[in-house]
Amino acid sequence: MADEATRKAVSEIPLLKTNSGPRDKELWVQRLREEYLALIKYVENNKAADNDWFRLESNKEGTRWFGKCWYIHELLKYEFDMEFDIPVTYPATAPEVAIPELDGKTAKMYRGGKICLTDHFKPLWARNVPKFGLAHLMALGLGPWLAVEIPDLIAKGLIQHKDQNS
């Protein structure tokens, strides 16, 4: 299960109420509003705790999301582009976050750079539909994945800090 800091961070993210995906145009607007409010609250909380680690934005329809995430290791910032699409069956199905530049560098990743969240995150998501949203995906999915995988990839020499490449 999650550590105490993660539990605290997640407990401060507003739960969502609208059970709607992109196919339901009217309710989807309401769901998106809730998603943005939860994401804003999560980012504000992270900044207040000096734990700011991602930026995220979407297309106009809220169906394609993209941004940057980063991980600090030994005082060096490793930054990655990330992207995901909202599944048509959302929120019953969690989005699959991709970090394309890490594709093929870890076994905990699917083709196209989609991170593997099957064992730990997806059952938790399924138990919390429709209350969980994109902020929860970041807090309980991508964040822990980065914390485990990035130090391992650095130790194996599979990724290097951008300043070490010059």
UniProtKB/Swiss-Prot annotation:
Transmembrane domains' residue ranges: none
Keywords: Ubl conjugation pathway
Active site: 116
Listed InterPro entries: UBQ-conjugating_enzyme/RWD (IPR016135), Ufc1 (IPR014806)
SUPFAM superfamilies reported for this sequence: UBC-like
Function comment: E2-like enzyme which specifically catalyzes the second step in ufmylation. Accepts the ubiquitin-like modifier UFM1 from the E1 enzyme UBA5 and forms an intermediate with UFM1 via a thioester linkage. Ufmylation is involved in various processes, such as ribosome recycling, response to DNA damage, interferon response or reticulophagy (also called ER-phagy).
UniProt protein name: Ubiquitin-fold modifier-conjugating enzyme 1
Organism: Danio rerio (Zebrafish)
